[in-house]
UniProtKB/Swiss-Prot annotation:
Enzyme type, top EC level: transferase
UniProt similarity note: Belongs to the pyruvate, phosphate/water dikinase regulatory protein family. PSRP subfamily.
Catalytic reaction equation(s): [pyruvate, water dikinase] + ADP = [pyruvate, water dikinase]-phosphate + AMP + H(+); [pyruvate, water dikinase]-phosphate + phosphate + H(+) = [pyruvate, water dikinase] + diphosphate
NCBIfam families: PRK05339.1 (NF003742)
Keyword Kinase listed: yes
Originating species: Cupriavidus metallidurans (strain ATCC 43123 / DSM 2839 / NBRC 102507 / CH34)
Protein's job: Bifunctional serine/threonine kinase and phosphorylase involved in the regulation of the phosphoenolpyruvate synthase (PEPS) by catalyzing its phosphorylation/dephosphorylation.
Protein name per the record: Putative phosphoenolpyruvate synthase regulatory protein
UniProt keyword annotation of Kinase present: yes
One annotated GO molecular function: phosphotransferase activity, phosphate group as acceptor
Residues where ADP binds: G150, V151, S152, R153, S154, G155, K156, T157
Enzyme Commission (EC) number: 2.7.11.33, 2.7.4.28
Record's keyword terms, sorted: Kinase, Nucleotide-binding, Serine/threonine-protein kinase, Transferase
Length: 270
């Protein structure tokens, strides 16, 4: 198992996201060590000490993902006995040449920009999604950017919160239940906002596994019931002309990206 250090002068979210995408391409395990707020040369030297310690203990160079903007800190990290993947320098220096413009080299610039109207929008979106989780409220649905529907435990809540936190989208979600299937139509409260609705489905076998973790041995979790609910929900969405996807083999990120493409909402990524 190789050790991976994620070194940043801020929260490290950017570096960690990038490292996850890169390392996922390799079928091996990595031990991740997160080192946020390395925002001075002194802290960089401390980081180098820990990186070198891993090298001597393991006998192989650690892999280091960095997003440091301070030149002195960068110099210090580059002296470490490791493979250095400097994300900012890889992209910023070529862009400076192409644009004929020096970058600000400001620590946390991205997150400083977010502390404005966009940040306020994101907080409002999170509060909205929490208030409209699992059909808790029908109020202000006209303000929703998207309304997710699907059977219980098909991934609606985590997807709604991801859309709110990552994109500032006001995402409501509503469970489709046996009463809806008996009527053969969407809940009446949703019809006025049909253009905002997107459906989630799931493989019945996977659904019964998830539900058994919550209510083991119950009718709610029985595979026959799960198969019935999924079939009815999918039939309803087809009849109503609602776009939908199966969440069975998709990550939250993949589901959210598909929803953004299909619903055609326009919000900034944080």
């Amino acid at each position: 198992m190789r050790t991976v250090f994620i070194v940043s002068d801020g929260t490290g979210i950017t570096a960690e996201t990038f490292s996850h995408s890169i390392l996922a391409q390799f079928e091996m395990r990595f031990r991740k060590v997160r080192m946020p707020f390395v925002d001075t040369p002194d802290k960089a030297h401390v980081a180098v000490g820990k990186i070198n310690e891993a090298f001597y203990n393991e006998g192989v160079p650690p892999i280091v993902f960095t997003t440091l903007v301070n030149a002195e800190s960068n110099k210090a990290i580059r002296r470490a006995k490791a493979m250095i993947l400097d994300m900012f320098q890889t992209f910023i220096e070529p862009l400076e040449k192409e644009l004929g413009l020096k970058s600000t080299h400001a620590i946390g610039r991205f997150h400083q920009n977010a502390d404005t109207e966009a940040y306020k929008n994101r907080i409002e979106a999170i509060n909205f999604s929490l208030a409209h989780d699992d059909g808790q409220s029908h109020k202000n649905l006209e303000d929703a950017d998207v309304i997710l529907v699907g059977v219980s435990r098909s991934g609606k809540t985590p997807t709604s919160l991801y859309l709110a936190m990552q994109y500032g989208l006001k995402a409501a979600n509503y469970p489709l239940i046996p009463d809806d299937f008996e009527r053969g139509r969407l809940p009446s409260a949703l019809y006025a906002y049909k253009q905002k609705i997107f459906g989630l489905s799931i493989d019945p076998q996977r659904l019964t596994e998830i539900r058994n973790e919550r209510r083991p041995g119950s009718k709610y979790a029985a595979v026959e019931n799960c198969r019935y609910e999924v079939n009815e929900a999918e039939s309803m969405m087809r009849r109503e002309g609602i776009k939908w996807l199966s969440s069975t083999h998709k990550s939250i990120e993949e589901i959210a990206t598909t929803i953004l493409q299909e619903i055609k909402v326009d919000r900034d990524n944080y």
